[in-house]
Amino acid sequence: MSLIQKIIGRFLPRQRVIARFNAASRSPESLRNFQGSDFLSADAAMSRSIRKLIASRARNEFVNNSYANGIVTTLADDTVGRGPRLQIEGGEETEAYSRREKRFHKWAKAVKLNELLRCARIAKALDGETFIRLQLNPNAPREVKLEPRIYEAEYVESSTLAETPLEYYDSGEPVEIDGIFYDQYGNPTQYRFWRLHPGSPLGGATTAFTMDDARNVIHYGNFYRAGQHRGISEMAPALNIFNDLRRYSTAVVLSAEVAARLSFIISNDLPAEMMEGTVEVDENGQIAKTALDIRGPISLSSGDFNGLVLPAGYKTSQMKAEQPTQQYCSFKDAKIAEAARVFSMPFNVAAGNSSAYNYASGRLDHQVYHKKLLIERDEIATVILDRIYEAWQAFDAAKHLEDYPSTDESHYWMWDGFEHVDPVKEANAQALRLANGVTTLAEECAREGRDYQTILRQRAREIQDCEEKGLPPMPWMNVQQPVVLPEKED
């Protein structure tokens, strides 16, 4: 640009650039698309009636839609697996730790802890939340009488009909949110439980309830908004998708049934003027005379052959079954993938079909799903398992004080590992990590859900047995460089 153009350009009117957010448009189309948007708080948006309505629809979809049932059940099975195993770390008192771990494992099997965790995971997906009460069972034939018991969300409700909190502290925290009482700092203090489920035959006729201290109640739910106190169903965004899937499947089946029930269709290609005035009707409304032979078809039979004789100008044809079979499969797969995205579940797991997958694509899809499972396992360990272990430990220490020599200890929960789609690649990577010293045997075993101490003890027994029986040592017993097997291309 020349100097003269720059000088002249200063005196010319400048063109304004108009920019805006399309999402903030107030056009009729945008208002229709976002007609459900509001500024409600988390508790107001997730009121009791809203939560119960969504939960009831999610449960209905779960028991009537095989894909919804399979997705949620698979999610719970993959999350819990065979159940978490307690691992205690601390000083040198390994034998004492081992005895405690065995007692807890035995107690967990007796109270069906794994079943409780799977039920809790399903409840979070369908209902949005669940409650676990740490109560005692004096009649239980075991040393520790503690027995956690799970309750549906409807058990914890307010005695009033108010949908939103009526009282607040000066700090802004609510006094009660639908059966959960809080202090001025937002900590739950008490839970109000109905004696009977509100949906049971006598639940609506009773007003009996119990107040449980917060120390004895575990609240596990789906929380994603600031200030949210009650959980909302994880399936809420996918309910319409599952419903569309059922409706479309039903429509395709009905279309096929209609086509199968119609044996033939009779039609004619006569001009309209030939059909006018060709029928005379008597005083009783009965056909008296016809100019054209439009009587019904006459059936003929000759031996094993059957046929029809049609009136003049008429023809017959079979109804073509034109159900969208190819479109149905594509539509179904798209809906399943869309619904499973709520749980970060890959399509092949949700649909139970990996025909379109190879090792590379399967591994990439599963990485996201496995991260989701790891995050959920960590939440279960923090919210549920640590609380249960703390309560169990109080009873166990009273009877086995000798197994609690040190207070400087910690614990973690070991879960089932994830199987690799290519075992050779994973074994090579594991061997290189161990050889380079960037990992430990404990970490590698933890990835597979195994205890490295159990493996070392088994190795010691195998070495001793080989020496006693005069057998040559196994390949892994010889000190050598790690063997890396050749990898195959995908």
Show where each model-derived region lies.
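N-terminal-proximal low-complexity accessory segments that begin disordered
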Residues: M1-L86
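C-terminal anchoring/interaction modules
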Residues: S2-R14, N353, R363-L364, E379-W413, ...
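Structured, mid-chain assembly/scaffold modules that mediate subunit interfaces
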Residues: V63-F223, R433
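Surface-exposed loop-to-helix/strand elements on domain peripheries
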Residues: R85-L86, G90-K102, G307-K425
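Glycine-centered helix-boundary capping/hinge motifs
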Residues: K112, V342-S344, G449, G470
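Short coil/turn segments at secondary-structure boundaries
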Residues: C119-A123, L134-L136, A256-F264, A350-S354, ...
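Charge-rich, acidic-biased intrinsically disordered regions
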Residues: F131-A153, P271-G296, R387-F418, N478-D490
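Extended, charged amphipathic alpha-helical segments
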Residues: V217-L364, V483-V484
